Amino acid sequence: MKKTINIIVLILLISFNSNAQNNYQIKRATSFSEYATTQLKLTKEDQKFLYDTYLAKFVAQREKIHGKELSDEEKKQIYKASRNELVKTLNTRFNTEKTKAIMAAVKEVRDKEK
């Protein structure tokens, strides 16, 4: 009985921690997509695309980094590869100039958050 209660408590704690991480990623993806949309006057469909793209980026980064004892250099490589993949994905929907403008807008909002 005691083991069952401990297991249930452990599952709940893991669930809450996972939700907290997902909420952070959702908040960032929302912030980035909303800011870029207002700055560049993008459509709601474009905003949804940006949101989905950034959320996928953040989730993938977390999976590659979280819980692993990586050096700063290894993390930088993951972030760089993630950025390159993001640019490729954005280029499937937007032209190069629009992609650069989106990246600049996101950098601007990211710098404001610091």
Region spans (language model):
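Charge-rich (acidic/polar
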Residues: 21-114
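Bacterial Sec-dependent N-terminal signal peptides
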Residues: 1-25
